[in-house]
Each structure stands twice: as structure tokens, then as C-alpha cells.
Amino acid sequence: MTAIYKDAGRPVHERVADLLARMTPEEKFAQMHAYWLILDENGNHRERSDLSDEFAGVSEQAALSERLKLGVGQITRPLGTHIVDAKTGVRAANRLQRMMMEETRLGIPALFHEECLVGLLCKDATLFPSSLNYGSTWDPELVQRAAQQIGKEARSVGCQQGLAPVLDVSRDVRWGRTEETFGEDPWLVGVMATAYVKGLQGDKRDLLATLKHYVGHSFSEGARNHAPVHLGFSELNDTFLLPFEMAVKLANAGSVMPAYHDIDNQPGHSDSFLLTTVLREQWGFDGIIVADYGGVSLLHQHHGISHDAAESAALAFNAGLDVELPKDDCARHLADAVERGLISMAKVDEIVGRVLTEKFRLGLFENPYADENGIDLQNEMTRQVAREVATKSVTLLENNGILPLNGKPRVALVGPTADDPLALLSGYSFPAHLIISDMVEETSQVTTPRAALEHYLGASQVRYAKGCHIIEKRMAGAPVFPGDSGGKPMQQSPVSQSTALIPEAVNAALESDVVVACVGDLAGLFQSGTVGEGSDTDSLNLPGVQQLLLEALVATGKPVIVVMTGGRPYTLQGLEDKVAALIVAWAPGQGGGWAIADVLTGRAEPQGRLVVSVPKSAGAMPYYYNHKLKSGGTPFAFHFGSRYPFGFGLGWTTFRWNAARVAASSVPVDGEVTLSVDITNTGERSGSEVVQVYVRDKVATQVRPLQELKAFQRVTLSPGETATLSFTLPVEMFNFTRRDGKRIVEPGEFELQVGASSADIRQVVTVNVTGETRVLPAEWRMLSTCEVTRA
């Protein structure tokens, strides 16, 4: 007779109960962790090690073989760990899965996870733009389409869980992982993350999105990776938890990953209040919680809240963790933890039940293998969508009329990022990610600005000069320490300080009609680059001698168009007023060169709008537009504020905004506000505007931000065309968190600020919210809507 757990016709909860009853404690523990392996299509799998293969002897192989007979919860990044072509990687993963299904006692399949923030992290997958690019499009539908394409590539290689998106809310752009965020507004982060999760998971949730880093990871001391976070619950809930709540409730996210840091002395991996009370009990999250890599071990190694690995495992799993990643450093000690009374088998059963539930839901027991002939990477649709995101995220910050370029001028294309494919990629793209492991992946699918401009203008019209290096040699274990601090340790691969190439760039400029200067940074993990995870900085000056290069180019008197790429905004130390144009393209991925060239030549409009403020200086940090009135200090600090505000971006045309109006000047606390505004294209070219609606609570029982984004809509208009935008905002969106942890809406006056950026407010309307203070229900309304009517 077929076992209940093998019967696909039985309800999932019955299958889980039957399987749990058959499992030994050791088999249960095995489901609570992953293995990080170098898989082999012949079955000679080995554990990933930083040591050379000669240290991984037969005894270790035998030990791994014995451990695998117990099964395993997950396999860590089978295609993303090393350079392997997809078909070979899938064949190797299938070989391991066949062992799980046929050579273990109960035949429980493994779940395979990969990174997928900016595309599936494996050889030959499409290299999508960064999350800052996603956010800068202000186009959730496009973000959802991008995630759909990433999901299709992931499914085609047998991936069931993607470790994305990142829901950290940017607060200090010195933080190296700023590039992974959707920006600095919590609601916009939530909107974009919700779109990404819906796209990646699909309607069936047959690929799990992973919300990370739960929570507040971006607000660490001094913007330093892993450093403590200091937040009260009101701000934690209103700013940092909000995007997670939205993605859980609106998109049914399948997984959550806690963060490395501690909040109020409690590390994220052992915080039962956040992992269980808030996430599961209050929000109704029904997926699995997976550790950030090594996060459980840090409980005793760094945080010092446990004595050993067994205690760390017990703390994390009791708090709400389901699976330790990337391997079993602490979970292997669970038997010891049970024997010592640190965790109960009842708790283990609860956790393993959740893991098995997800495997049954995913259909892994019925369809455990990937189709080796169904791999679909880099198809026409994925390339097209990646390029569309790159193009629509290009943001124009300055333009004295030189853009778009007319005809085919003689262009001096200068700068260290003009012809470097890696300069267009973010840290979690496959080629950049490999640098930390001293592996080099070819980047032929990346089109650089040089290649695109030479294609459009002709090679004879483009004179290229590198101008300077950012880092002369990319390598692992080579700290570059971006920034201005002295007293640095010996650097194996420092940021270059050589000015030897600048004269050649100046000569190129003098012999050209216009200069396109490409500057920025290089993404790399743990200081193998100037931005990225563990690559934080103390300065917002361009790395190396790029500022000197720009100054020399401006001094020629030729018009200089600056194209900045990278993972954080940088200041130009006053050159913003002297250059002819300034474009920010972030890390635009493999189609980035085309996107930049399309905007420069007028083939595309710069449609991007900033999702992180560009601070006046590093002294303003942490800086974000939705700050409090007193954030600038008393007396007001001259360095506080932004050079370019949140929501800002120029286009090719101009718009007239007619008076905003509301359907009713008074609304009840459980009602909604309808706000309308007319927009007319007064220019000579078709163009788009992002109409933004901010709300200010004029008087509240707690200190509130000066403004908060609550609605937006992009509208594209032909010359002379007018459209009416009618926004509907539930009053529930005007809420904040009271000291008792409850979300409330208070009666009173609220300003609705309608503008082209957070600083460019064109119209202000006041509404009066009436009634008594209202505590919001669990299923409160989180989204506004907009209807566009054309005249």
C-alpha cells in the first residue's frame, strides 16, 4: 500500500503528519539545514571549501556520503557557487536529487536555492540591472515583468527558492548594500518588493521569493556592515517592517531571511518577537524562515549570546528559524541541544513540519528533477526586459541643453567605466560575485557605453581614453578600503591614485566636440570592490582620482556630460554646476551601454526618478527625504540636505500643473480621499512625468515626518496633451505606530502635497479627517490607486 505521504491526492497536512511520524530525530535534523556542495554529474560531490582540493580527502567524502543518506533540507546555490555551464550543473543537481529520492530511507527531495536579485546568479543567465534601477523606473508593472523573467530562468535550471528581493530601506548611502535596495521610501520599497515577489513566485508560488534582510539592516551604526541598529518599535514598524508586511500580506511571500545585526541588543536570528510574534502570528506568514549565511553561528562567534553551536542552534530555531544556511555548522549539533534540554522534539517537529509542508506545496515529491533539455537562459524576452529596465531607470540630473546630442558629433569618451563591463554590474551579478572567490567569468553579453556609442555614431566619431583606473587589479582577499580615512592597513589591491592617464584624456577632449565622462564605482563583496556587501565607505567622493579627471576635463572648456554608474550616489564637489549634463544610470546590467547611449542620442527619454536622495555631503548622513523637522539640528546644519532630492529627474519636455482638488474636504477615519490634478505637456516633444503625492500629518500625538510618499503615477503625454490624474488614498494609509505597537489613524488636518519630486511640490491641498482615533485591523488598506483620463 502506498504510504500516505507519497499519495499526491491526499491533503498536505495529512502527508506531513504521516511523514513526520516515520522520521528518526536525525532525519528530522537533516531537514533543518542545507549543504553547500560542489556538485558533480558523476556523483562525486564534495563540500565547498576555501582550501584547495588536496585538503578535502577521502575521509571527508565518506563522511559527506554518510550524512547525505539522512537527507537534507536544502542545497545551497548548486549553479551559483562556481563556474559551471547550466546543463552540466543541472545534470549534477539531478544526480544528487536522485540520491535523495532513491538512496535515502524515506525519499525526501532536497530544495535547491539560488541568488536572484539582479537575475539568476549562474553562468550565462541574464544580467539584470540593480534594485536601485528597478526602483528608479517608478514602474511596478515593469519590475514584476523583470521578476517573471528571472523566475522563468530560475525554474528552468531546477531552482525552487530565490534569495531575493531585498527590502532594506536606504538610510545612509555610505552603506555598501545601498545598491541592493529599492530606495529610501518604505512604502515605495513595499510597492516594488510586492511587484517583484508576485513576478518571481507566479500565481502558483512554485518558486519561493525570500524577503531580506529582516529587519532594519540598512540603518546600522555608521552604515557599517553587520553593525548594531538602534530603533524604537514605532520607527521600526513604520519604516523598516512596513515593506515586509506589504510583501507578506499582498504578495504571499514564501520565505523570509533574518539579518545579521542586533536591534536593542537582540540579534535578528534569535529574535522570537520579530520572527514569530510579528511575522507569523500578527501577519499570518505561512512560509519558511531561512538563515542568512552563517547567521546562526554569529550568535556565539560575534554576538556572544551563546556558548557554542548547540546553544546557537537552539536559540535560532526556538525563535522561529526553519532552515540554517548555507550549511549545517550549528544544526549538526541539534542532537546535543535536545539532549541538553535546549530545544524540544516538539519544537523540532513543528519546524520540520513547515519545511515538509513547503516541499509538498512545491510539488517536489512528484516532480523532483529539472529538465536538462529545458534550460532557458538569455532568451530574447529576458534581454529585452533587462534593457527596458535599464533604459527607463536612467536619470537626468543636469542638462544645459546639450542633451539629447544632435547629429553625430566628435565625442571624447573618457573614464574608467566607459568600457568596463563589470562597472555596469552590481555585487550580486554572477561575474562580480565571483571576484571574492578569485574566479573570473567572461562578460561578453554586456554592452558597454563605448560599444553602444561606437555603434550609433560610428567608431571614427568616438575617441576613447580610459583617463584613470578605479582598481587596477580585481582580486580576492584584496581590501580596497574606499574612502578618505588615513591609517589604513596594507592594501593588496587599493583604489588607484595614479593620474598618469589623465593627460591622454585631456588631449582626447581637446580634439572633440563634446566629452562623455563615465565615472562611478566597481561592485565587489567584502572590499573586493568600492561598493557592495561589506564594501562600505566613509566618503561620498568618487573613488580614486576620478574627481581630478573630471576637473581636468571641465578645465578644457569643452562641454562635459558626466555619466555616473554604480551602487550609491556620489558628490562632484561643485562640478555639478560646471558640467553640461549629469546622468545617473546606477548599475544597469548587460543592456546598460545601450540604455545610456539611447538617452545620450535621444533615442530614449530619461524617465528615471531618484529613489535615494543625493546628499550635499557625507556630513549629512544618515539622510533621507522623509525626515523630522528637527533632523537638521539647531541651529540648522549647513551640510544637511540633498543636492538632488528624492523623486527628482529631468526629461525632454515641460509640464504645466493645474490646481489640485479633492472630492471632499472632510473624510472619516475609515474613509478615503480622492485627489485630482490636471497635467499638460507644454513642450515640443512627447514625454513622461511621474506625479507624486506626499502626505503630511500637521498635528499628531507623536512626532511625524515632514512628508511621506503615499501615491504616484507615471503619465506620458504628447505635446499639448492634457490628462487628469485622479488618486484614491485610503485614510488608513495615514497611519503610524503608537507606543503600544498598534497602528492607528488619528483625526486632524493632513496636507496632500502634489509634485514632481519631494522638493518640487506644485500643489498643496488640505483635508480634515474626522471621527475618533482608530486602531487599524490586521488587513488594513496599504495601496492607493490612480485613474488617468485624457482630454
Predicted features and spans:
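Glycoside hydrolase catalytic-domain context in secreted enzymes
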Residues: M1-N735, E746-V754, S758, W780, ...
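Short proline/glycine-enriched turn/loop segments at secondary-structure junctions
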Residues: D740-R743
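Short beta-strand elements
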Residues: D760-V775
